[in-house]
Amino acid sequence: MKSCAVSLTTAAVAFGDEAKKMAEGKASRESEEESVSLTVEEREALGGMDSRLFGFVRLHEDGARTKTLLGKAVRCYESLILKAEGKVESDFFCQLGHFNLLLEDYSKALSAYQRYYSLQADYWKNAAFLYGLGLVYFYYNAFHWAIKAFQDVLYVDPSFCRAKEIHLRLGLMFKVNTDYKSSLKHFQLALIDCNPCTLSNAEIQFHIAHLYETQRKYHSAKEAYEQLLQTENLPAQVKATVLQQLGWMHHNMDLVGDKATKESYAIQYLQKSLEADPNSGQSWYFLGRCYSSIGKVQDAFISYRQSIDKSEASADTWCSIGVLYQQQNQPMDALQAYICAVQLDHGHAAAWMDLGTLYESCNQPQDAIKCYLNAARSKRCSNTSTLAARIKFLQNGSDNWNGGQSLSHHPVQQVYSLCLTPQKLQHLEQLRANRDNLNPAQKHQLEQLESQFVLMQQMRHKEVAQVRTTGIHNGAITDSSLPTNSVSNRQPHGALTRVSSVSQPGVRPACVEKLLSSGAFSAGCIPCGTSKILGSTDTILLGSNCIAGSESNGNVPYLQQNTHTLPHNHTDLNSSTEEPWRKQLSNSAQGLHKSQSSCLSGPNEEQPLFSTGSAQYHQATSTGIKKANEHLTLPSNSVPQGDADSHLSCHTATSGGQQGIMFTKESKPSKNRSLVPETSRHTGDTSNGCADVKGLSNHVHQLIADAVSSPNHGDSPNLLIADNPQLSALLIGKANGNVGTGTCDKVNNIHPAVHTKTDHSVASSPSSAISTATPSPKSTEQRSINSVTSLNSPHSGLHTVNGEGLGKSQSSTKVDLPLASHRSTSQILPSMSVSICPSSTEVLKACRNPGKNGLSNSCILLDKCPPPRPPTSPYPPLPKDKLNPPTPSIYLENKRDAFFPPLHQFCTNPKNPVTVIRGLAGALKLDLGLFSTKTLVEANNEHMVEVRTQLLQPADENWDPTGTKKIWRCESNRSHTTIAKYAQYQASSFQESLREENEKRTQHKDHSDNESTSSENSGRRRKGPFKTIKFGTNIDLSDNKKWKLQLHELTKLPAFARVVSAGNLLTHVGHTILGMNTVQLYMKVPGSRTPGHQENNNFCSVNINIGPGDCEWFVVPEDYWGVLNDFCEKNNLNFLMSSWWPNLEDLYEANVPVYRFIQRPGDLVWINAGTVHWVQAVGWCNNIAWNVGPLTACQYKLAVERYEWNKLKSVKSPVPMVHLSWNMARNIKVSDPKLFEMIKYCLLKILKQYQTLREALVAAGKEVIWHGRTNDEPAHYCSICEVEVFNLLFVTNESNTQKTYIVHCHDCARKTSKSLENFVVLEQYKMEDLIQVYDQFTLALSLSSSS
């Protein structure tokens, strides 16, 4: 890889030269300059330092010398840059970014990386830069951009030495984004890598087990946890966390066994967990939940008390305590506990509903209504309709209620309002520190805050004195079985963290003091305001669960005197969690606020910077596990999605338990260590496994960010270099004054992944180089010099640097880049000008120097190509009246029309994204009955059918399961059955529909009534619940013996649409690709959906409707797939792998044209290359489909682009493009110059790579064994990363002996075994054979030119 290290010798010389030019009289200035000069030894030590050492370099204790050296280097670089007015080599900024990153000065690192990105056109070649940039994004929780940066690293350098760290972070971030399949894949890739990592394999295995848990795969999770417990020398903290998770799963999840048995196991596991880590507040809390569920009230209270003593107060814990008090007929204590809960988390829906229930039972409907309204405002209360009905009921009947007197000895509003929020306390400290410089308004504000603070202290002492002896009554338990769901049953989230052994004094609500001073709880130091994170740095964070916004004043009404008990209201009410906070991380939801003592947003914001999941004001007091002299934060949160009954019905709390799984590696052990953060874990029956990824750094640090914060924070601290304004301005660039202001919309813009499409096809795609041999980086990388400071306008054009054009700013003196002995040798050197004209002899001669000629990856196009990017929306945008274009359709009257050559040309024309050929079956006399359900059952009734369970919805709409809002995610769960069983379902569905129609006819007498009822039914469909349907899909008809008649019938089609033909690229693959060069069948009932997608590798497709019903199609041209990809990312969906159904309103607003048409029986739909489409059945019907690859430059280009995009996204390409390209060269005479150039260059590239790798293996003493290849042998893919492996197969010794041949690519083999001692290298093609194919593949003369 290309190094970004600046020659420190050159830097020192340049610095010295500048010093000589200074006036002799400025001795003090010269002395200052000499103080930051670097010695030869220092330059050598710094020569090998870049982002790859992040997390591995020690800066404290014995590493203090390194920290000092890095600080000195930063000052030297800053001084040099300042003197040169920013006109220095771009690599200076990159190295400055690395040094600041290693010093964990993320804002400075970000500024320097920004500058390097704006100056370096081919920044993407620098893997160390991309990695460092990804780490900064990761630190700031800008996961959308961190993912892109890390994927770029793996794309340009798959053998990157920190690939394991990247896969680990990608796994965590995809878990946050609920892309569980991708998350699991990256965790597994991290697990097989033998390179050093900041987490142990046991810790990674824990993440995998927890990932299963978050997907509700409880049995798989249980097996994974139990298997992890069998690991030898398992760290105590990992063991404690695993036992904690197992205990909670037995209590809360649907595991085998009766309730008593599961509770018994749960208690045993939790007790064992506490033996391993007695200071885990979370385990104590879970134990309290278990005791509560079996009626052991005193034990439950003791456990809750321990939880509060061991960790900071959480809203969930206080809500659970309130429920127990309520059960014991202690309404006043219950009231105080609920008040504590809502003070700690004003959005705690369950606590508000519990409080409302309490007021209802005491005949205070108006107060109950206020609480219910607060609950309804919470994002975590999804079932607002039931709650609204309850509020309406109380409003209508409140006049009949009898009021009583308050049980409270003091106004609850007073308690609530006197608790200063952490923001106000911080603001008070700031005002006190600047007392002498305040204006009159600020002085008045200071007086008010000080007065309120004194009253709060007085109230606290008064309450402690009043209730010192208050406790739990020892009377009979009114309900021997306390509610098991006294807090929401959301799955908690295993977390690997540590709690500070010395809690810092903090501010807590007065009611907390009161209840802690009662007989049931000790009045120990239980801060809810601050926590000290263990580690070498004393970072003090204000806890996010002590938030009591000023808007809440007066929202907690008085509790009137009433002697009634507190009955359970058995009103079903769901209070599920809020939408996952990750949705706000994508495009400008994060503020980049960070101060030395607090991460709060500022005095004007009531919420902390970052909410980890459904517990929006989540307690963030976690650290982690002792490791070898390094600190690592590896959070992992649970963002529950399941519904949980509220306390209005059975006391279920809903504050989401988001826990950060954080390992802390340090040199000194701590007494109090917990792998689970002591946070609110009112968790529910599911866990969305959201990883609160706060930093994976070599120091413990946390960023509490606000998931719903405004994109622009005017009062946020500046992220620039505050101690050097001049340097700050230089690093920003004088033309860009808004860089680094602490807002996420600025941060998002820094990433080099701005979508751009130039005239050279897709500029950001490797295939942009297809038409030109060696394009200039400037032409293909125009986006790199777009304004890097405002992603709000990513296409703001070129900007100047220091008043000059970019070209001038880059004309500074170039310096040599020294390499330390341990520096990666995978340099990216300037690519040679490559032509497709040279013979194979010249090609091989040019690459006789293994490892020294370009990229190490297997990109089959130009070395100069950056990682691929989706295209932006075409410009100018279409007018609104052009967004519903007519669908290109052709009507066939006879067989001659079907074979008319212009039909083929019309279908394959790139200007036609889709073509509907009407009447094809009739014109060709196709016997569609061969594909009818009846015939299929008669032919092979036990044939396997993949079944997708879906919700019946209108074709142009897609609602969430509750029917409350339109979404992109399309529910489609997979299972399997047989043709016979699905045929039975298909028939019964039809019969049921007939019965429903008959019932409608008998019930309604006139047409108007029918219309009214139809309208009502339509409205109900949108409100849910929706009817469940089953769609039979992907039925394989490839077996010629089983489906001979059906496959023979399809030979009647014209050649361009046939499954097998000489002009079909997929025919030349040489082996079967199910569903692509074979036929697949689909069996449908009304509403069956094929979600949005592009065909595999962007190949064309043919689809024929067998009937008897119709299908409705929605089609978007290929040019707009980037827009749909962006929509998917905004909705936390994977464009390639997820199931999604576009919202037509969103597409209309984005000016995306949509073709919409009906496919009738006998119609053939031709989907052109790259076209995006989704389909819904209107009636009962069957369809058949397959893919076709026209022999055109457009098809090949789009196929290669998707091949590279799949590689970037770690998705397997079903079509092996390298293998296919060599077969095309053998079998096809190509007359199209563009297509010929693309294929020829692919061959050249692969030939170079093969020669280079083979020579490197021979030079290393690794034997290459001839293996050969059978005729129909499929192309090979790496069993680890799933990239295509051509010719040289790395096979494990064991599989080679057993003849199973488990193939690895070279990079994965090296990661598994650095010296390849466990692998055998098999060769499938002789070099002579490939040389012959390459030389003989020449441009054929077309018929027109020859004539």
Curated annotation (Swiss-Prot):
TPR repeat ranges, renumbered to this chain: 90-123, 127-160, 167-196, 202-235, 247-280, 281-314, 315-348, 349-382
Superkingdom assignment: Eukaryota
GO molecular function: chromatin DNA binding; histone demethylase activity; histone H3K27me2/H3K27me3 demethylase activity; metal ion binding; RNA polymerase II cis-regulatory region sequence-specific DNA binding
SMART domains: JmjC, TPR
Class in the EC hierarchy, top level: oxidoreductase
Biased composition annotated in UniProt, kind: Low complexity: 761-779
Region (Disordered): 571-621, 633-689, 757-819, 990-1026
Cofactor(s) listed: L-ascorbate; Fe(2+)
InterPro entries: Corepressor-Demethylase, JmjC_dom, KDM6_GATAL_sf, KDM6A_B-like_C-hel, KDM6A_B-like_GATAL, TPR-like_helical_dom_sf, TPR_rpt
Biased composition (Polar residues): 571-601, 609-621, 782-795
Basic and acidic residues composition-biased segments: 993-1010
Keywords on record: Chromatin regulator, Dioxygenase, Iron, Metal-binding, Nucleus, Oxidoreductase, Phosphoprotein, Repeat, TPR repeat, Zinc
Domain JmjC residue range list: 1042-1205
Annotated Zn(2+) binding sites: 1278, 1281, 1305, 1308
Reactions catalysed: N(6),N(6),N(6)-trimethyl-L-lysyl(27)-[histone H3] + 2 2-oxoglutarate + 2 O2 = N(6)-methyl-L-lysyl(27)-[histone H3] + 2 formaldehyde + 2 succinate + 2 CO2
Subcellular location: Nucleus
EC number(s) on file: 1.14.11.68
Effect of residue 1093 to A: Abolishes lysine demethylase activity
Protein family per UniProt: Belongs to the UTX family.
The protein's role, per its UniProt record: Male-specific histone demethylase that catalyzes trimethylated 'Lys-27' (H3K27me3) demethylation in histone H3. Has relatively low lysine demethylase activity.
Protein name: Histone demethylase UTY
